[in-house]
From Swiss-Prot:
Annexin repeats lie at residues 41-112, 113-184, 197-266, 270-341. Homodimer. One of its GO terms (molecular function) is acetylcholine receptor activity. May act as a low affinity receptor for acetylcholine. InterPro entries: Annexin, Annexin_repeat, Annexin_repeat_CS, Annexin_sf, ANX9. Pfam families: Annexin. One of its GO terms (biological process) is cell-cell adhesion. Keywords: Annexin, Receptor, Repeat. Belongs to the annexin family. GO terms for cellular component: cell surface; collagen-containing extracellular matrix; cytosol; synapse. PANTHER family: ANNEXIN (PTHR10502), ANNEXIN A9 (PTHR10502:SF122). This is Annexin A9. It comes from Mus musculus. PROSITE patterns: ANNEXIN_1 (PS00223), ANNEXIN_2 (PS51897).
Length: 345
C-alpha cells in the first residue's frame, strides 16, 4: 500500500484549530495539575497539625488528609524532614501506625518521593503476572526523562538489580522489546518544528511493517519518536490507509503483543484520555481498584489531572469527581476527592 496520499501538512487554520482543545490548555493558575505549591506554606504549622492529629485520643483523619493533599510533593518532603528533626520520629512510620487500609496506602504514596513510588510500582508490576504490559508500560512511557532516570536509579538502589534485568527475566516477546527500549530513555524531544519528511518516512515504515507483520519497526518508532511527532504520524496514517493505527495493530498482532502495542499507542496518542479510561475501568470493577486510583491520581496530580478530568467528562458524560463520590467509600474517599479537587460542570 502506498503512502502517497496528498499533502502531508494540514492547513494553517487546521493547525490552529487542532491546538485549541480544552484538555490541552494550561489552567489559569499555570498548571494542568489539580495540586500546586501551597502559597501559605508553613512547615512548622504543618508539623504541629500532623503531630496533634495522631497524638490525641483518636486519629484526626480530616487533618491528615487536608495537609497532605494540599501540599506539593516537594512540600510534603519538607514536612517529613522537619517532622523528623523536631520529633525524632519518622513521619511515614508514625502515620502508618495511626492509619490502616487504603487510606494508609494513599498516605504512604503521598509521602514517598515520586521516584521511589514509581520504582515500587514498577517492581510490583514486573513481579506480578498479568500486569506488566499495563503498569510497567505506563510508568516507562509517560514519565518525563528526569523522572524516568530517577525511578530507574531508585529501582537499582532499593532492589539491588537493574530494572532492565528484571524486564528480561519477567517478560518476553514484543512487550519485553518495548519495555527495554523505553527503559533506555532514548525518546526524542520535540523541537517545535514539524518535520514533514520524517513524518512521511515514518508513515511508509509503519505501512510496510504492517504488511509484513514485523514488530521491529513498530517498537523503534513507538519508543523513540516524540509523542508530538507520533500524533501527526498517527493522523497521517489514518488519512493514507483509511484505518486507525490501533486497527492495523489488531490486524497484525495477537495476544500480549497486541495489548502492549495498543496500550502504548493509546498513551502516546492522548495521554490524558488513556488515564481517564484507566480511572473509569478502576471504578467499574466489583470493588474499586484502589491501586490504580491511587497511582494515577497521585502521579498526575501535579502535571495533567485537569486534562484527565476533562477527557473523563467528555467520554463518559459524568465527572471524575462525581464518579469517585458515587463509588468510593471509607476513610480514603476524602483523600481521593481532594486529589481530584473539584467537580466539572
Amino acid at each position: 500500500m502506498s503512502a502517497s496520499c496528498g499533502p502531508l501538512g494540514t492547513s494553517l487554520t487546521q493547525e490552529i484549530l487542532s491546538s485549541l482543545g480544552l484538555a490541552d490548555k494550561t489552567a489559569a493558575w499555570g498548571t494542568l495539575g489539580t495540586l500546586r505549591t501551597f502559597l501559605s506554606f508553613s512547615v512548622d504549622k504543618d508539623v504541629q497539625r500532623l503531630l496533634k492529629a495522631i497524638a490525641g485520643q483518636g486519629v484526626d483523619y480530616d487533618t491528615i488528609v487536608d495537609v497532605l493533599t494540599n501540599r506539593s510533593r516537594e512540600q510534603r518532603q519538607l514536612i517529613s524532614r522537619a517532622f523528623q528533626e523536631r520529633t525524632k520520629q519518622d513521619l511515614l512510620k508514625s502515620l502508618q501506625a495511626a492509619l490502616s487500609g487504603n487510606l494508609e496506602k494513599i498516605v504512604v504514596a503521598l509521602l514517598q518521593p515520586a521516584a521511589q513510588f514509581d520504582a515500587q510500582e514498577l517492581r510490583t508490576a514486573l513481579k506480578t503476572s498479568g500486569s506488566a504490559e499495563d503498569v510497567a508500560l505506563e510508568i516507562l512511557a509517560t514519565r518525563a526523562a528526569p523522572g524516568l532516570q530517577a525511578c530507574l536509579a531508585v529501582y537499582k538502589h532499593d532492589f539491588q538489580v537493574e530494572a532492565e534485568e528484571d524486564i528480561r527475566t519477567e517478560t518476553n516477546g514484543i512487550l519485553q522489546d518495548l519495555l527495554l527500549a523505553l527503559s533506555k530513555g532514548d525518546r526524542e524531544s520535540y523541537s517545535g518544528i514539524i518535520d514533514y519528511n520524517l513524518e512521511e518516512q515514518d508513515v511508509r515504515a509503519l505501512q510496510q511493517a504492517g504488511e509484513s507483520s514485523t514488530a521491529g519497526q513498530w517498537v523503534l518508532l513507538l519508543t523513540q519518536r516524540s509523542p508530538e511527532h507520533l500524533i501527526r504520524v498517527f493522523d497521517q496514517y489514518r488519512r493514507c490507509t483509511g484505518q486507525e493505527l490501533e486497527d492495523a495493530i489488531r490486524n497484525c498482532f495477537h495476544g500480549d503483543a497486541q495489548l502492549a502495542l495498543i496500550s502504548l499507542a493509546s498513551m502516546l496518542r492522548n495521554t490524558a484520555l488513556y488515564f481517564a479510561n484507566k480511572l473509569h475501568q478502576a471504578l467499574q470493577e466489583t470493588e474499586p481498584n484502589f491501586q490504580v486510583l491511587t497511582r494515577v491520581l497521585i502521579s498526575r496530580s501535579e502535571s495533567d489531572l485537569l486534562s484527565i478530568r476533562a477527557e473523563f467528562k467528555k467520554k463518559f458524560g459524568k465527572s471524575l469527581y462525581s464518579s469517585l463520590q458515587d463509588v468510593v467509600r471509607g476513610d480514603c474517599r476524602s483523600a481521593l476527592l481532594a486529589l481530584c479537587r473539584a467537580e466539572d460542570i
